[in-house]
Amino acid sequence: SAGFYYTGQMESDARDLRVKMEWFWKSHAAATAVVLGSSRVLFGINASFIHSESVLNMGFPSGDIHAISFLTLNYVLKHMPKLKFAVLEFSPDFMWDKEALFWSPVYKKSPGFKYDKTHDFWKDSIPKGFVELVEESYKPIAEQTQPYSYDEFLMPSNGWGRATVVHDTMKYELDDDDVDYNMALYKFVINSLVEKGVQVILVVPPQNPGYAKTGAFGIYAGRRSHAEELLKRAAKLNAVMMDENKMGKHDYTSSMAYNTDHLSREGAKQLSERLDSLFVDLQK
């Protein structure tokens, strides 16, 4: 099971994570910045546009705070000795996610993650030949139907399109155990990083500016008033806020978008270059 993070029985989301785990074990010792979150940062932040730091992007589809927490506490903090910056996605419309929704099924079906856990995530030493085992494990082949490659994770420009909302915004309340738990988890993860001398940046990826004309924050709902309150709470955490969505009042044009909540190559360039400048500013 060593190094087998993905099997053919797992959801497609886990394929991208399998690729990211190989990247992790190959570059954990040298990387100075890590990015964690969902497909919004997977496609929205790209190391090729960042020059001030050596960036490892661990974003993958459905990578909510539960996945961010697991990867940070068990891998990032144990195996990234040169880490200066951790960039964590903060998307208010994910704040109602339960662990059982996305992360638990990935973890439960992954022999590699469970194997790592039985060895305390190799915190004392990584076994000889381990990276080779990860490399040789079941490897997904980029499907011709998917618009990106596993080499670069950049999307073509399709435009923002319609500001569609998948869930009923009235279904979600701010006074909610999941919201409270997820906010507490953000606080714990951020403080754990800061204690190790890592600066944390909370990035809010842009979505379709058309949501400003609806009652929803974004594609997965969440009322706009609730999102504003969640952003205020996030701003009180021990992290630098990088709000690129600005409640829809941003400057990411339609040519910078792949769809209603993902950036294209052009958008990724703008976001990544801004992050690069922020890295530089934070070290002045």
Language-model features and meaning:
Residues 90, 99-199:
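Secreted/periplasmic serine-hydrolase-like ester/acetyl group-modifying domain
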